[in-house]
Amino acid sequence: MAVKIKLTRLGKIRNPQYRIVVADARTRRDGRSIEVIGRYHPKEEPSLIELNSERAQYWLGVGAQPTEPVLQLLKITGDWQKFKGLPGAEGTLKVKEPKPSKLDLFNAALAEAEGGPSNEATQPKKKKAPAKKAASDIEATADPAGNADKSEPAAEGEDATVAGATEG
């Protein structure tokens, strides 16, 4: 029986994801497989290539033929060089940088905050309008005895007569 190592397609329309499988050469692309030995996601950056190297070496050793795309993946991971006894068995696989854990991020932020808690405002204070301050100073100097209460109703009355004159 002729055995091939090939890709079976999974995923959405524009987001292909593949399984690297060992299957009979006569089966269709997504047909029954003998064994799944890895996966390949070409749309990720860098492309995700996971391959069980031990099982790939076994199947290559018993005569399984890789298809062209799988052969390229085997060369990237270094399994083809290892099988053939060529130099460069470490491969050229790019590895995605691991994400920092949330605990590490939290500890870093905590250390930064302890380093110098600032009492300064993030935005400068807005200055009050000088007209209000000047008006309150004038009232305080004009009537220090507290007669300001008597003068206010008179001012209100004047405003009322002026408003009444304009209405009529």
UniProtKB/Swiss-Prot annotation:
GO biological process: translation
PANTHER family the record matches: 30S RIBOSOMAL PROTEIN S16, SMALL RIBOSOMAL SUBUNIT PROTEIN BS16M
Alphabetical UniProt keywords: Ribonucleoprotein, Ribosomal protein
Entry superkingdom: Bacteria
Annotated stretches, region: Disordered: 110-168
GO MF: structural constituent of ribosome
Pfam families linked: Ribosomal_S16 (PF00886)
Source species of the chain: Mycobacterium sp. (strain KMS)
GO cellular component terms, A-Z: cytoplasm; small ribosomal subunit
Family matches, as InterPro entries: Ribosomal_bS16, Ribosomal_bS16_CS, Ribosomal_bS16_dom_sf
Family to which the UniProt record says this protein belongs: Belongs to the bacterial ribosomal protein bS16 family.
Classification of source organism: Bacteria, Bacillati, Actinomycetota, Actinomycetes, Mycobacteriales
Name under which the protein is recorded: Small ribosomal subunit protein bS16
Gene it is expressed from: rpsP
NCBIfam families per record: PRK14520.1 (NF011093), S16 (TIGR00002)
